[in-house]
């Protein structure tokens, strides 16, 4: 199908001039954040440099301009201060949290324990799910998408008296499915089936919706509206709003009070009186007044670039534009097929783009190979990035829709967690099943050429043309065909260097003993990663198991030797519950080595259940060597060097022609491992472990690996040793693998049936 153009040629050209910085970049993550226009930022600069804006508690000029912004926001949503109060927050998440913290679930005359209900749609953002942790009621219930409309009652009951709250999104941020906003008044008037005594109020998450749609609060009137401004304008970030319907503010019982929110307060006697006006009562302290003022230029930019036309408001025209783009993308992707006729794209949509009333400007999908297996979303996103196509991959902080679309139960999700899968990681495949998806989200400045580039990239990189790469002949003897564990690499400190073991290494319940047992954290308790701090590779830890000491080396530092039996293990408020601080001596050494102040070393306790065990990466050395010329000493040296780049734990010798993607479980001696995903090739592999730098040689060698598309490694989860007395993993012996067809092999030809993987 052809793209249906909403903008005139002049409007499209004017918009393109605002985003010259994009050049050949194709930005398709407007669901995460849209982009700011160049003239918008220039106008903000001019406004700030031409005026002196002081604290609004002092400056009358600043306060007046902030009030003008409030009126502008309300007018943008077709309402005014007689219908809604506006409270500035740090974003939609903070707005949702404010409602959750302060909503009163008990009527004034109700008995103790006689409380209302908190009901939420499962297809909500994580920030809504987080409300469950702090709402003032124990009656917390989820609703499935397909049951949502059915739960509406036919008529109201006179017994409705318990204040209750229902939360749902105007538009699903996962795939832009829209919910009928007519439900708002129906729920307020009629309630929900099974909640006869509950008087429901509606909290509407519009963060995704208002980014590319017009929200008409004169027509649809939820009690609470939560939003972020950067989703609409790109700038400023860190600013959102909570809009409260008049009359509903009485349901919020605010406890804390900060500067500027009280009429009187006594420092001795515990007495205070809050302001009555919601914006004065709820906006604690000094608001980000410069960011608030900057919103004016966001509104001006949208109205200037996309003026109302043919009876449609600016944001209604944006809605038409992104819907047309998404529909065009949906059909273009849907037409892709492999040479054998198999579909290339699996969609995760709740509509087929029949109506703009029910669908917004997002297309969510995964790529399929010609055999029907999936391309991992993380691998896809990285390849797309190499082609300057910027997308979002994962579950987009919407586990409810992600589970529903991937057909993953709560029990299945928990099983993935036990295998090491956590939110935000790159573990995109488990047992051949995707753990997330790819999202293309469109904004007002997106062009059809951006969609064309996405489709072209998929056609170039993922669509099979029926030409297979011949298998390279091998000169290895049959003895070399056996599967053998050659070496073990231990990484005591996450994102730092490793040491090699060629004999044996002890195993514990969580896997390899001491592997990723420590993390370097900053003053906020956030772990450092080599992907952002490449010089972490220069710190090489080694553990001597006989004396139980940790030895740290660095090119510019004297070695530091720490006795693990006497290591300080103090609890710290900045660290997770299952971690302890390792003391000042090692903290000072690490801070000096990395040239960053106030770093600490955290030790992760093995007896907690707060975090999953680290995944074990198995690398096939033969597969790496197969990438180059067998007779080239340089190529084979590069292959050995790449083993360290991939930061594998177990280096095995398996035939390069073996398809590791068919492996299901592995047994090495008495120790069993479950395959939980293929190597996702994270950015840390570009870092030279010897120098801690991203070198040209690294990029060249690894680009060659990716180009040949050879599966080089897989992630394993340690299952156990079946109660065996020997707790060490031995190098040098053969191992047994179970393939997905349930066959078990120790070499290419020899079948083995003696090992029981079920214990």
UniProtKB/Swiss-Prot annotation:
Taxonomic superkingdom: Eukaryota
Gene Ontology biological process: Mo-molybdopterin cofactor biosynthetic process; molybdopterin cofactor metabolic process
EC number: 2.8.1.9
Reactions performed catalytically: Mo-molybdopterin + L-cysteine + AH2 = thio-Mo-molybdopterin + L-alanine + A + H2O
Signal sequence region: none
N6-(pyridoxal phosphate)lysine, modified sites: 231
Active-site residues per Swiss-Prot or TrEMBL entry: 397
GO terms for MF: lyase activity; molybdenum cofactor sulfurtransferase activity; molybdenum ion binding; pyridoxal phosphate binding
Domain MOSC positions: 591-738
InterPro entries in alphabetical order: Aminotrans_V_dom, MoCF_Sase_C, MoCo_sulfurase, MOCOS_middle, PyrdxlP-dep_Trfase, PyrdxlP-dep_Trfase_major, PyrdxlP-dep_Trfase_small
UniProtKB keywords: Molybdenum cofactor biosynthesis, Pyridoxal phosphate, Transferase
Cofactor(s) this protein cannot do without: pyridoxal 5'-phosphate
Function per UniProt: Sulfurates the molybdenum cofactor. Sulfation of molybdenum is essential for xanthine dehydrogenase (XDH) and aldehyde oxidase (ADO) enzymes in which molybdenum cofactor is liganded by 1 oxygen and 1 sulfur atom in active form.
Similarity field: Belongs to the class-V pyridoxal-phosphate-dependent aminotransferase family. MOCOS subfamily.
HAMAP family referenced in this protein's UniProt entry, alphabetically: MOCOS
Name assigned to this protein: Molybdenum cofactor sulfurase 1
Species of the source: Culex quinquefasciatus (Southern house mosquito)
């Amino acid at each position: 199908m052809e793209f249906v153009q909403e903008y005139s040629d002049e409007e499209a050209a004017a918009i393109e001039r605002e985003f010259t910085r994009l050049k050949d970049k194709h930005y398709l993550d407007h669901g995460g954040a849209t982009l700011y226009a160049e003239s918008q930022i220039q106008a903000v600069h001019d406004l700030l440099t031409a005026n002196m804006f002081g604290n609004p508690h002092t400056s009358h000029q600043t306060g007046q301009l902030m009030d003008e912004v409030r009126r502008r926001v309300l007018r943008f949503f077709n309402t005014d201060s007689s219908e809604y109060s506006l409270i500035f927050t740090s974003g939609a998440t903070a707005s949702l949290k404010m409602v959750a913290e302060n909503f009163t679930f008990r009527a004034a005359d109700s008995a103790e324990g006689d409380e209302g209900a908190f009901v939420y749609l499962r297809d909500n953002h994580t920030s809504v799910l987080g409300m469950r942790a702090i709402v003032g009621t124990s009656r917390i219930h989820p609703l499935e998408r397909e049951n949502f409309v059915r739960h509406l009652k036919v008529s109201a009951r006179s017994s409705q008296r318990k204040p209750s709250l229902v939360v749902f999104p105007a538009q699903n941020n996962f795939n832009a499915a829209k919910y009928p906003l007519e439900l708002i008044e129906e729920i307020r008037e009629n309630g929900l089936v099974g909640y006869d005594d509950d008087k429901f109020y509606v909290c509407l998450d519009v963060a995704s919706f208002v980014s590319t749609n017009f929200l008409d609060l004169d027509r649809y009137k939820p009690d609470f509206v939560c939003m972020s401004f950067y989703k609409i304008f790109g700038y400023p970030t860190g600013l959102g709003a909570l809009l409260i319907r008049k009359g509903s503010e009485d349901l919020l019982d605010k406890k804390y009070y900060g500067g500027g929110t009280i009429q009187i307060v006594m420092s001795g006697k515990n007495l205070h009186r809050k302001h009555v006006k919601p914006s004065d009562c709820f906006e604690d302290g000094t608001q980000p007044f410069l960011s608030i003022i900057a919103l004016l230029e966001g509104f001006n930019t949208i109205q200037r670039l996309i003026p109302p036309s043919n009876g449609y408001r600016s944001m209604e025209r944006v809605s038409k534009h992104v819907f047309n783009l998404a529909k065009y993308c949906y059909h273009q992707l849907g037409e892709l097929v492999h040479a054998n006729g198999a579909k290339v794209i699996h969609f995760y949509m709740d509509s087929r783009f029949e109506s703009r009333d029910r669908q917004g400007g997002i297309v969510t999908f995964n790529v399929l190979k010609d055999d029907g297996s999936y391309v991992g979303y993380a691998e896809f996103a990285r390849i797309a990035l190499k082609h300057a196509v910027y997308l979002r991959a994962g579950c987009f902080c919407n586990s409810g829709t992600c589970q529903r679309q991937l057909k993953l139960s709560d029990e299945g999700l928990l099983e993935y967690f036990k295998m090491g899968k956590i939110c935000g990681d790159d573990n995109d495949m488990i047992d051949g099943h995707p753990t997330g998806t790819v999202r293309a989200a469109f904004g007002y400045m997106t062009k059809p050429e951006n969609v064309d580039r996405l489709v072209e990239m998929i056609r170039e990189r993922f669509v099979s043309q029926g030409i297979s790469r011949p298998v390279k002949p091998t000169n290895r003897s049959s003895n070399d065909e056996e599967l053998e564990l050659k070496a073990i690499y231990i990484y005591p400190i996450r994102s730092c260097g490793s040491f090699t073991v060629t004999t044996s290494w002890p195993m514990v319940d969580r896997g390899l003993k001491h592997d990723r047992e420590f993390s370097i954290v900053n003053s906020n308790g956030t772990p450092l990663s080599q992907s952002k701090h490449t010089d972490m590779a220069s710190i090489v830890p080694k553990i001597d198991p006989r004396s139980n000491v940790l030895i740290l080396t660095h090119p510019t530092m004297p070695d530091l030797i720490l006795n693990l039996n006497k290591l300080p293990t103090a609890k710290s408020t900045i660290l997770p519950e299952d971690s302890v601080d390792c003391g000042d001596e090692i903290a000072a050494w690490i801070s000096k080595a990395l040239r960053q102040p106030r770093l600490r070393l955290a030790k992760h306790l093995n007896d907690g259940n707060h975090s999953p065990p680290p995944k074990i990466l198995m690398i096939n050395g033969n597969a790496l060597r197969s990438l180059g010329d067998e007779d080239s000493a340089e190529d084979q040296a590069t292959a050995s060097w790449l083993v360290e780049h991939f930061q594998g734990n177990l280096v095995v010798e398996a035939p390069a022609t073996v398809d590791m993607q068919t492996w299901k479980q592995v047994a090495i001696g008495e120790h069993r491992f479950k395959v939980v995903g293929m190597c996702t090739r994270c950015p840390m592999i570009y870092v030279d472990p010897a120098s801690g730098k991203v070198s040209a040689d690294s990029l060249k060698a690894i680009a060659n690996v990716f180009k040949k598309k050879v599966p080089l490694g897989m992630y394993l989860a340690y299952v156990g040793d079946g109660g065996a007395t020997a707790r060490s993993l031995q190098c040098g012996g053969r191992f047994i693998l179970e393939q997905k067809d349930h066959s078990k092999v120790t070499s290419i030809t020899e079948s083995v049936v003696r090992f029981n993987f079920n214990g």
